[in-house]
């Protein structure tokens, strides 16, 4: 937050407790994405009837829906991939794990702050747009899980945009669908 607040182009400010988070710093990426730095959060406590016997689970798996394990990554559309990538590196300590360059223009970058292949990706928005979300990815497990989900989506007439298949970048398993609000969701897994 100190690095971002010193950067006048980041346009950030502090916010108090919102949505179960403590004090957080909201700022704009170089492309206009609204981002929050959060480091305190209320941890979910399941009611007694939903508590899992498996201690590493926040609650029992649901009997309906898809029991994803965690949010895996965000993919942001950007007019300037390099500027967004460098902001994540300079201010948040991310490192670039993979990138795609067309001629001398960076059109994709995958970044991580830990051992994951990526937590944030940014891709060139060929429409000229600014600050858009491409998708939110949830970690679902392995290739068979995505095949099972695809069969369920077909049975219930939920349109599949792409997959199941394997990404060339990251080598992760993927399945893309749109949720009812129109947001693109990726179910992401390991090979």
Where are these regions (language model features)?
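Short helix/strand-bridging catalytic loops that position acidic/His residues to coordinate divalent metals
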Residues: 124-126, 134-137, 164-167
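N-terminal beta-strand motif that seeds the catalytic metal site of vicinal oxygen chelate
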Residues: 49-82, 95, 131-138
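Vicinal oxygen chelate
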Residues: 1-67, 70-79, 109-110, 157-191, ...
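Short helix-capping and hinge/turn segments at secondary-structure transitions, especially at repeat
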Residues: 89-97, 116, 138-145, 155-159
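A structural feature that tracks compact, well-ordered secondary-structure segments
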Residues: 38, 87-89, 110-112, 120-125, ...
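Core segments of cupin and vicinal oxygen chelate
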Residues: 76-117
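Short glycine/serine/proline-enriched coil/turn segments at secondary-structure junctions
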Residues: 103, 128-130, 169
């Amino acid at each position: 937050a100190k690095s971002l607040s010193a950067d006048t182009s980041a346009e950030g400010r502090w916010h108090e407790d919102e949505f179960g988070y403590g004090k957080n710093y909201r700022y704009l990426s170089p492309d206009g994405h609204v981002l929050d730095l959060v480091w305190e959060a209320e941890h979910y406590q399941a009611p007694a009837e939903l508590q899992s016997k498996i201690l590493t689970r926040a609650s029992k798996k649901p009997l309906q829906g898809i029991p994803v394990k965690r949010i895996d990554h965000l993919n942001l559309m950007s007019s300037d991939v390099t500027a967004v990538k460098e902001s994540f590196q300079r201010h948040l300590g991310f490192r670039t794990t993979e990138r795609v360059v067309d001629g001398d223009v960076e059109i994709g970058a995958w970044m991580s702050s830990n051992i994951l292949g990526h937590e944030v990706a940014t891709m060139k928005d060929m429409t000229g747009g600014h600050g858009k979300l491409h998708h939110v990815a949830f970690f679902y497990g392995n290739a068979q899980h995505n095949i099972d989900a695809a069969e369920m989506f077909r049975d219930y007439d939920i349109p599949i945009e792409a997959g199941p298949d394997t990404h060339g970048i990251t080598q992760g398993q993927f399945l893309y669908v749109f949720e009812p609000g129109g947001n693109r969701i990726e179910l992401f897994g390991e090979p």
